[in-house]
Amino acid sequence: MASEAAWPTTDKQELARLLLESHQRAFSRPLIASAQPGHSKRLICQHLFACGFPVLAHGTGSDPLILYGNSAALQLWGLRWEQLVGMPSRLTAPEEERSERQTALTEAQTKEAIRGYSGTRISQGGRRFQIRDARIWTLWNEDNLCCGQAACFSDWWWS
Protein backbone atom coordinates (compact mmCIF):
# COMPACT_ATOMS: atom_id res chain seq x y z
CA MET A 1 0.00 0.00 0.00
CA ALA A 2 1.60 3.26 -1.07
CA SER A 3 1.97 6.10 1.35
CA GLU A 4 3.32 9.59 1.22
CA ALA A 5 6.82 9.83 2.56
CA ALA A 6 6.75 10.93 6.16
CA TRP A 7 10.31 12.22 6.33
CA PRO A 8 10.12 15.88 5.25
CA THR A 9 9.15 17.35 8.63
CA THR A 10 11.80 18.51 11.07
CA ASP A 11 10.52 16.25 13.86
CA LYS A 12 10.67 13.18 11.59
CA GLN A 13 14.18 14.13 10.52
CA GLU A 14 15.14 14.30 14.20
CA LEU A 15 13.51 10.93 14.86
CA ALA A 16 15.41 9.42 11.93
CA ARG A 17 18.63 10.82 13.39
CA LEU A 18 17.85 9.22 16.77
CA LEU A 19 17.04 5.89 15.09
CA LEU A 20 20.28 5.87 13.14
CA GLU A 21 22.56 7.16 15.90
CA SER A 22 21.07 4.76 18.45
CA HIS A 23 21.51 1.85 16.02
CA GLN A 24 25.15 2.84 15.49
CA ARG A 25 25.63 3.02 19.27
CA ALA A 26 24.00 -0.37 19.86
CA PHE A 27 25.53 -2.38 17.02
CA SER A 28 28.68 -0.42 16.09
CA ARG A 29 27.57 -0.22 12.48
CA PRO A 30 25.24 2.00 10.46
CA LEU A 31 21.67 0.89 9.81
CA ILE A 32 21.85 2.27 6.26
CA ALA A 33 24.89 3.17 4.18
CA SER A 34 23.92 6.83 3.75
CA ALA A 35 23.93 7.41 7.53
CA GLN A 36 27.32 9.10 7.29
CA PRO A 37 28.50 12.51 8.44
CA GLY A 38 28.14 15.13 5.73
CA HIS A 39 24.97 13.75 4.16
CA SER A 40 21.92 15.98 4.47
CA LYS A 41 19.28 15.07 7.05
CA ARG A 42 16.64 15.10 4.35
CA LEU A 43 18.58 12.68 2.13
CA ILE A 44 19.22 10.33 5.04
CA CYS A 45 15.50 10.41 5.92
CA GLN A 46 14.60 9.61 2.32
CA HIS A 47 16.98 6.64 2.31
CA LEU A 48 15.67 5.34 5.65
CA PHE A 49 12.07 5.64 4.49
CA ALA A 50 12.83 3.90 1.18
CA CYS A 51 15.29 1.23 2.35
CA GLY A 52 14.29 -2.29 1.38
CA PHE A 53 13.63 -3.69 4.86
CA PRO A 54 11.10 -2.76 7.56
CA VAL A 55 12.16 -0.29 10.25
CA LEU A 56 9.76 0.65 13.05
CA ALA A 57 10.02 2.60 16.29
CA HIS A 58 7.79 3.14 19.29
CA GLY A 59 7.92 5.51 22.23
CA THR A 60 8.00 4.78 25.94
CA GLY A 61 5.25 3.99 28.43
CA SER A 62 3.25 0.96 29.48
CA ASP A 63 1.55 0.66 26.06
CA PRO A 64 3.96 2.44 23.69
CA LEU A 65 2.68 3.97 20.47
CA ILE A 66 4.39 3.59 17.13
CA LEU A 67 6.37 6.70 16.21
CA TYR A 68 7.83 5.61 12.89
CA GLY A 69 7.47 3.01 10.17
CA ASN A 70 9.24 3.19 6.85
CA SER A 71 7.75 2.30 3.47
CA ALA A 72 8.66 -1.39 3.77
CA ALA A 73 6.93 -1.58 7.17
CA LEU A 74 3.85 0.22 5.85
CA GLN A 75 3.59 -2.20 2.94
CA LEU A 76 4.15 -5.31 5.06
CA TRP A 77 1.53 -4.36 7.65
CA GLY A 78 -0.81 -3.03 4.94
CA LEU A 79 -1.22 0.37 6.55
CA ARG A 80 -0.89 4.03 5.64
CA TRP A 81 1.37 6.30 7.68
CA GLU A 82 -1.53 7.88 9.57
CA GLN A 83 -2.85 4.41 10.49
CA LEU A 84 0.48 3.03 11.72
CA VAL A 85 1.84 6.04 13.59
CA GLY A 86 0.00 6.40 16.88
CA MET A 87 -1.10 2.76 16.95
CA PRO A 88 -0.12 0.75 20.06
CA SER A 89 2.92 -1.25 18.98
CA ARG A 90 1.59 -4.41 20.66
CA LEU A 91 -1.00 -4.60 17.86
CA THR A 92 1.73 -5.52 15.36
CA ALA A 93 1.76 -9.01 16.90
CA PRO A 94 -1.09 -11.49 17.35
CA GLU A 95 -2.50 -11.52 20.88
CA GLU A 96 -1.02 -14.92 21.73
CA GLU A 97 2.48 -13.69 20.74
CA ARG A 98 2.46 -10.43 22.70
CA SER A 99 3.94 -11.84 25.91
CA GLU A 100 6.96 -13.23 24.03
CA ARG A 101 7.30 -9.95 22.14
CA GLN A 102 7.24 -8.00 25.41
CA THR A 103 9.91 -10.28 26.88
CA ALA A 104 12.18 -9.49 23.93
CA LEU A 105 11.52 -5.75 24.25
CA THR A 106 12.34 -5.88 27.97
CA GLU A 107 15.56 -7.77 27.26
CA ALA A 108 16.51 -5.24 24.60
CA GLN A 109 15.81 -2.41 27.04
CA THR A 110 17.95 -4.03 29.73
CA LYS A 111 20.84 -4.82 27.39
CA GLU A 112 20.38 -1.70 25.20
CA ALA A 113 19.94 -3.96 22.16
CA ILE A 114 19.44 -7.53 21.02
CA ARG A 115 19.84 -9.31 17.72
CA GLY A 116 18.42 -12.61 16.52
CA TYR A 117 14.80 -12.08 17.65
CA SER A 118 12.19 -14.19 15.85
CA GLY A 119 8.42 -14.06 16.18
CA THR A 120 5.03 -13.90 14.53
CA ARG A 121 3.44 -10.66 13.39
CA ILE A 122 0.04 -9.86 11.90
CA SER A 123 -0.89 -7.47 9.11
CA GLN A 124 -3.85 -5.10 9.15
CA GLY A 125 -5.79 -7.64 7.08
CA GLY A 126 -5.12 -10.43 9.60
CA ARG A 127 -2.45 -12.19 7.59
CA ARG A 128 0.32 -13.64 9.75
CA PHE A 129 3.99 -13.56 8.92
CA GLN A 130 7.16 -14.74 10.57
CA ILE A 131 10.14 -12.51 11.22
CA ARG A 132 13.60 -13.88 11.88
CA ASP A 133 16.88 -12.40 13.03
CA ALA A 134 15.39 -9.02 13.95
CA ARG A 135 17.45 -6.37 15.71
CA ILE A 136 15.82 -4.40 18.53
CA TRP A 137 17.56 -1.40 20.05
CA THR A 138 16.96 1.40 22.53
CA LEU A 139 16.52 4.96 21.29
CA TRP A 140 18.53 7.56 23.21
CA ASN A 141 17.93 11.31 23.10
CA GLU A 142 20.53 14.10 23.37
CA ASP A 143 20.37 13.91 27.18
CA ASN A 144 21.18 10.18 27.05
CA LEU A 145 17.67 9.30 28.21
CA CYS A 146 15.69 6.42 26.76
CA CYS A 147 12.96 7.75 24.47
CA GLY A 148 11.79 4.51 22.83
CA GLN A 149 12.84 1.42 20.97
CA ALA A 150 13.29 0.51 17.33
CA ALA A 151 13.42 -2.71 15.35
CA CYS A 152 14.39 -3.84 11.89
CA PHE A 153 14.50 -7.13 10.04
CA SER A 154 15.02 -8.31 6.51
CA ASP A 155 14.12 -11.97 6.89
CA TRP A 156 10.36 -12.59 6.88
CA TRP A 157 7.77 -14.80 5.19
CA TRP A 158 4.00 -15.27 5.19
CA SER A 159 2.78 -18.01 7.55
Feature names for model-found ranges:
Residues L43-S159:
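Sensory/regulatory domains in signal-transduction proteins
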Residues A35-C45:
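Acidic, metal-coordinating catalytic segment for phosphate/diphosphate chemistry
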Residues M1-A33:
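Short, low-complexity N-terminal regulatory "tails/caps" that precede and couple sensory modules
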